[in-house]
């Protein structure tokens, strides 16, 4: 129930419906099942919307309507009396939060329109008002709120900024690292530290590899819930644990034994083949068969009796025995067909070989790891101290501060837990452990609602851990009292052709070992409507492979590349779709794993006239030509004796010196000087004192004079003006901004130049000043191999989309092409010199000196890189995690398609005919084979090969060069232009006459309804005021009396470093303060200061607020006391929207605005509006805002059907607060 109080103190009660019981939910499901609605909710959706009172995990497959479920659940909570501000709703991105907020807003507006109950309308209106302040956003945004509000409890200032620019972070990191590195090199334990650095960098002078190690360890620790504890307790966990053969995990032993048994089984299958040749012509066993039988028997015996024969202590002996037993090669050949029977076992043996030697030397690396632990810990502390000093933090810092606040302050934690009715999380599969800890602290233990799909967890590079979702899934299924699992399987996005191929592929591919989830019936996609099941034969999925048997040389040689021929295949299919089926270009999307070859795709499409837009995201801003020219210009202004920058500026379009000009200038050296810079030669050339003044002709002399004069003016301006103004001066002086507008990609080039000025302005606002520091910052960014994000420009709508699979997540497209399916998965991380793991900590490759082991006496040392046991353990887990994520990437890519999916790759047709495995074992591809295959294409071909007797719902087709000729590819059909010769016969035709009549009628209608045409659909009171008010005076400008005109005066320049506070900012701050001010407490300076801390404004604005004037309003005016007396009737910052009729066009439009304050009583309403305008007579503001208050009153009357009896202006722009009744 909700209680409002009328003027007489009597309660007005809203009775809310209770939450549904399980029986009521079942009843609702039955009713929905037999309803007449065209689009019915599924039983699982209903269960997810209405189940309450416990933790809920919703496993929502692709296209299953999870956003719909979340919005409906939120609305149901509101309708049952849970205010929107009592829901914590976390989304993965800001964009997702915005879309969710808009959907909730639309639902609330719709509900208000349907509701006839007055009190319910009031309540829902309050929810609309609260929506903008509700906790709907990313975890980062919420953490910032917590730290801004309670940071003082852990010594963090509320006035901080976020370092979102990676370049700025790298510059600070480098400074901290360099200082700390010097300290460690001079400490007592320096020899161990030098050995550590050499182990990774080779020597102590080149520290780049060691620096990368430290940065990676730091970043990894930041994703944990407590970096300090992880570094102290988990960082060396595996190094301390795995020091003997007995310490090897049982799981690794099981994998080795499984590989041995699989090898025996596969070898038996091969020997049973008809063409194998078990017997000789004489009828006896062949030598090959005898040898293979021995291998089969011994491998089976060793697996069965492992504990008795070997045990963990004898593992090295087992490795030697197996190595001696099996052949060195991988294949067994039968009838010229090779079967890779021993390949997987060889890989496992390689992993375990030399274990005793490794363990012998592994203990020597432990002191090095302790030094690394100390260094990373010290780096973390020092880097944080610098950020605290700068009051600038990364997102992870803010999240850890929020966790610390909630952990260390029981009262704050409990206030949040008591406040939130439910803690809701979208995209739960992409959470990391830091975010999970924060959610746990906010929850009361039984009020979490989590939505996600582990099959779409693709953000491991952001330290997302799908096992968080997986563990919850298992826990809730095993122990229902902990929470409930709800599966949303129905897909409402894709046609059956897409659903069937997705199910066919992943039922053979995905399980707990690779993919992290068994793709069984409970995870398979089901069509959500009958329309999706209508078959279309031409929409069957296609695996189109360019036959590389006779590669024409167009394909790049690197493994990353996509060949010209592959792109041509795509272009051919798109032309066919567009010409034959009329598919618009915007319905087609190309998905790639990375953007490295986008230029090839764009170039090829341009050749065929196919419009294409990319998703952007490339970080090549500083490498764009126009930006490089400007940076060299700035470098030259900073130091003209920088020859590289000076030559670049001279050769640029701004001055256009050619090679001949530069050669003539270069010869103007001073014979007395050995080294002479180009700038000095230019100055000598101008005054004719160079070595060869005769080479400087009049034209060149004129160019030199212009350049030197311009450079001099720029250098002078750089000392006085801002960077922003300097850059625009350069643009204007040499017309460079206009010049790039005439070049290719003009819009992008101008956007880049404009962004350079803005970034320079942002740089100076962040506290850094001067051209030198700006250039130094840019150069450091380039030194660290970083760049700034490209500037986005508007893209054409009617074009094929090209984006990464990651970027496509959450989107859907009618036709999807998955390109470069032959690209090998990136396994770079598993070959690094170190691998990190959350449970095991760090594992490294140790550079051991085995001189003593070899008995070597002539050499100083014999260094061998060894994979330590922790490294091998982490490597295997990382390999499986990488393959799992790639498998989920393929799932995301395939499930974006609505109608048809294409796979594009290249392969050798002859080699692909080789059977990958001799026998199908169960429904899944064998684990060893899935680990071995390292491309999407290999997975698909293996499934097509091994499960060829099944309908896999996709076809494999090889494309030859002959299929990709210009004639075969075809051309886009463009609209046929009219033949001018045919027009002469139509001049007086009836068609032309009718057309002219229609044009005349349209012109007449346009003239009659001109006002309606130009009428906007949405307007605000301020716009209406501006439209009818003859004076255009911005807020904060003094109103000048008409009878007088102020005389011009001279004001001394203002040299304060503090930015001028805008009057509009003060007005916004006042409105925020009046909104959050607690009226239940006595209004005094302390109350106002406490409330001031909670508003979102900078310190300058807060200081500019006149708190004494606000205190005077509440204490000295009758209206201020009225606020405190009737605070239960008060509504503050209330949004509204009403329909109005334009007096000229008689057309309707929507009027929207926000009312500062109003008092709602049983039979009337009192309206209040605050104004900070400066004035001389109150009557002036009364006239100015009279119409605006009339609009507010009209909105309130329409909403509540009550008269507005009083309308007040609270004027805060004078010497004291004044109340004016309007």
From Swiss-Prot:
Coiled coil feature spans: none
Alphabetical list of SUPFAM superfamilies matching this protein: P-loop containing nucleoside triphosphate hydrolases, Restriction endonuclease-like
InterPro entries: AddA, DNA_helicase_UvrD-like_C, DNA_helicase_UvrD/REP, P-loop_NTPase, PDDEXK-like_dom_sf, PDDEXK_AddAB-type, Restrct_endonuc-II-like, UvrD-like_ATP-bd
EC number: 3.1.-.-, 5.6.2.4
GO biological process: double-strand break repair via homologous recombination
GO CC annotation terms, alphabetical: cytosol; DNA helicase complex
Ion transport found in the keyword field: no
CDD domains: DEXQc_UvrD (cd17932)
Domain UvrD-like helicase C-terminal residue range list: 524-810
Binding site for ATP: 60-67
Xref: PANTHER family: ATP-DEPENDENT HELICASE_NUCLEASE SUBUNIT A, UVRD / RECB / PCRA DNA HELICASE FAMILY MEMBER
Function: The heterodimer acts as both an ATP-dependent DNA helicase and an ATP-dependent, dual-direction single-stranded exonuclease. Recognizes the chi site generating a DNA molecule suitable for the initiation of homologous recombination. The AddA nuclease domain is required for chi fragment generation; this subunit has the helicase and 3' -> 5' nuclease activities.
HAMAP family: AddA
Protein family membership: Belongs to the helicase family. AddA subfamily.
Name of the molecule in the record: ATP-dependent helicase/nuclease subunit A
Source organism (scientific name): Streptococcus pyogenes serotype M3 (strain ATCC BAA-595 / MGAS315)
């Amino acid at each position: 129930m909700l209680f409002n109080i009328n003027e007489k103190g009597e309660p007005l009660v809203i009775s809310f419906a209770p939450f549904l019981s399980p029986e009521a939910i079942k009843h609702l499901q039955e009713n929905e099942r037999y309803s007449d609605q065209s689009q019915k909710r599924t039983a699982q959706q209903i269960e997810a919307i209405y189940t309450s009172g416990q933790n809920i995990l919703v496993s929502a497959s692709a296209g299953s309507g999870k956003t719909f479920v979340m919005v409906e659940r939120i609305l149901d909570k509101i309708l049952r009396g849970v205010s929107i501000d009592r829901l914590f709703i976390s989304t993965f991105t800001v964009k997702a939060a915005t879309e969710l907020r808009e959907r909730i807003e639309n639902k609330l507006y719709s509900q208000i329109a349907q509701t006839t109950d007055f009190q319910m309308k009031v309540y829902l209106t309050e929810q609309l008002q609260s929506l903008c302040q509700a906790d709907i956003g990313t975890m980062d945004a919420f953490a910032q709120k917590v730290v801004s509000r309670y940071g003082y409890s852990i010594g963090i200032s509320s006035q901080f900024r976020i370092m979102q620019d990676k370049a700025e972070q790298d510059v600070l990191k480098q400074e901290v690292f360099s200082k700390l590195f010097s300290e460690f090199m001079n400490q007592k334990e320096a020899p161990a530290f030098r050995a550590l650095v050499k182990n990774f960098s080779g020597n102590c002078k080149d520290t780049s590899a060691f620096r990368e190690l430290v940065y990676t360890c730091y970043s990894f620790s930041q994703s944990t819930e407590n970096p300090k504890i992880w570094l102290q307790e988990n960082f060396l966990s595996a190094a301390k644990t795995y020091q003997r053969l007995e310490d090897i995990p049982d799981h690794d032993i099981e994998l080795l034994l499984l590989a041995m048994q699989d090898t025996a089984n596969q070898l038996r299958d091969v020997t049973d083949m008809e063409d194998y040749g078990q017997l000789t012509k004489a009828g006896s066993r062949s030598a090959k068969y005898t040898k293979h039988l021995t291998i089969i028997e011994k491998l089976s015996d060793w697996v069965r009796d492992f504990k008795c024969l070997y045990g963990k202590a004898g593992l090295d002996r087992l490795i030697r025995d197996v190595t001696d037993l099996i052949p060195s090669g991988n294949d067994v050949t039968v009838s010229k067909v090779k079967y890779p029977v021993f390949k997987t076992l060889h890989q496992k043996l390689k992993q375990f070989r030399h274990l005793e030697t490794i363990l012998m030397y592994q203990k020597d690396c432990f002191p090095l790891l302790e030094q690394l632990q100390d260094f990373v810990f010290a780096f973390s502390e020092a880097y944080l101290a610098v950020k605290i000093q700068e009051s600038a933090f990364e997102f992870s810092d803010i999240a850890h501060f929020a966790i610390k606040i909630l952990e260390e302050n029981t009262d704050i934690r409990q206030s949040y837990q008591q406040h939130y009715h439910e803690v809701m999380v979208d995209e739960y599969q992409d959470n990391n452990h830091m975010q999970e800890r924060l959610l746990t602290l906010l929850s009361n233990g039984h009020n979490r609602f989590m939505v996600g799909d582990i099959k779409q967890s693709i953000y491991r590079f952001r330290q997302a851990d799908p096992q968080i979702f997986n563990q919850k899934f298992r826990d809730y299924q095993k122990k229902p009292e902990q929470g409930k699992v709800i599966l949303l399987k129905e897909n409402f996005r894709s046609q059956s052709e897409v659903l069937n191929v997705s199910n066919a592929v992943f039922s053979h591919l995905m399980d707990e070992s690779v993919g992290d989830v068994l793709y069984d019936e409970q995870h398979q996609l089901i069509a959500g409507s009958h329309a999706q099941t209508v078959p279309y034969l031409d929409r069957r999925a296609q695996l189109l492979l360019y036959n590389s048997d006779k590669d024409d040389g167009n394909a790049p040689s690197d493994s990353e590349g996509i060949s010209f021929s592959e792109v041509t295949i795509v272009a051919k299919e798109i032309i066919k779709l567009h010409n034959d089926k009329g598919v618009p270009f915007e319905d087609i999307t190309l998905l790639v794993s990375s953007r490295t070859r986008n230029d090839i795709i764009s170039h090829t499409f341009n050749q065929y006239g196919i419009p294409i837009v990319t998703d952007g995201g490339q970080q090549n801003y500083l490498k764009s030509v126009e930006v490089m020219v400007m940076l060299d210009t700035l470098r030259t202004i900073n130091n003209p004796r920088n020859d590289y920058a000076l030559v670049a500026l001279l050769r640029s379009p701004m001055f256009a010196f050619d090679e001949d000009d530069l050669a003539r200038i270069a010869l103007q050296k001073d014979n007395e000087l050995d080294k002479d810079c180009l700038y000095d030669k230019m100055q000598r050339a101008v005054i004719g004192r160079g070595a060869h003044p005769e080479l400087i002709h009049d034209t060149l002399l004129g160019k030199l004079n212009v350049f030197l004069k311009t450079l001099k003016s720029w250098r002078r301006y750089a000392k006085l003006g801002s960077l922003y103004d300097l850059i625009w001066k350069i643009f204007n002086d040499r017309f460079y901004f206009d010049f790039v507008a005439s070049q290719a990609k003009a819009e992008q080039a101008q956007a880049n130049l404009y962004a350079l000025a803005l970034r320079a302005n942002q740089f100076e606002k962040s506290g850094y000043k001067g051209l030198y520091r700006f250039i130094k910052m840019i150069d450091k960014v380039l030194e660290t191999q970083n760049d700034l994000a490209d500037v986005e420009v508007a893209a054409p709508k009617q074009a094929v989309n090209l984006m990464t699979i990651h970027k496509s997540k959450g989107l859907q497209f009618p036709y999807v092409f998955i390109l470069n399916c032959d690209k090998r998965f990136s396994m770079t991380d598993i070959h690094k010199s170190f691998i990190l793991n959350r449970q095991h900590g760090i594992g490294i490759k140790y550079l051991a000196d085995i001189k003593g082991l070899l008995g070597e006496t002539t050499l100083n040392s014999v260094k061998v890189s060894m994979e330590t046991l922790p490294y091998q353990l982490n490597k295997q887990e990382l390999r499986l995690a990488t393959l799992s994520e790639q498998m989920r990437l393929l799932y995301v890519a395939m499930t974006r398609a609505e109608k048809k999916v294409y796979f594009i790759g290249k392969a050798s047709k002859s080699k692909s005919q080789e059977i990958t495995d001799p026998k199908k074992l169960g429904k899944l591809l064998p684990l060893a084979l899935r680990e071995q295959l390292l491309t999407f294409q290999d997975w698909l071909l293996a499934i097509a090969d091994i499960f060829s007797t099944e309908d896999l719902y996709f076809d494999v087709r090889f494309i030859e060069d002959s299929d990709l000729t210009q004639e075969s590819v075809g051309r886009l059909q463009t609209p046929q232009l009219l033949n001018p010769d045919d027009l002469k016969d139509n001049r007086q035709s009836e068609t032309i006459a009718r057309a002219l009549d229609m044009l005349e009628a349209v012109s007449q209608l346009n003239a009659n309804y001109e006002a309606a045409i130009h009428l906007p659909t949405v307007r605000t009171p301020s716009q209406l005021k501006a439209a009818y008010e003859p004076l255009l005076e911005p807020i904060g400008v003094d109103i000048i009396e008409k009878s007088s005109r102020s005389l011009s005066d001279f004001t001394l320049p203002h040299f304060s470093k503090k930015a001028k506070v805008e009057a509009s900012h003060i007005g916004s701050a006042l409105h925020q303060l009046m909104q959050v001010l607690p009226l239940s407490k006595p209004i005094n300076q302390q109350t106002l200061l406490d409330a001031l801390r909670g508003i979102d404004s900078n310190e300058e604005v807060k200081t500019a607020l006149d708190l004494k004037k606000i205190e005077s309003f509440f204490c000295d005016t009758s209206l201020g006391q009225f606020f405190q007396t009737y605070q239960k009737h008060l509504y503050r910052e209330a949004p509204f929207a009403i329909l109005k009729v334009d007096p000229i066009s008689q057309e309707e439009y929507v009027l929207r605005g926000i009312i500062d304050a109003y008092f709602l009583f049983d039979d009337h309403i009192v309206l209040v509006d605050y104004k900070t305008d400066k004035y001389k007579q109150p009557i002036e503001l009364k006239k100015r805002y009279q119409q605006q208050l009339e609009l507010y009153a009209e909105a309130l009357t329409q909403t509540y059907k009550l008269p507005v009896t009083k309308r007040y202006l609270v004027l805060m722009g004078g010497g004291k607060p004044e109340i004016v009744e309007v």
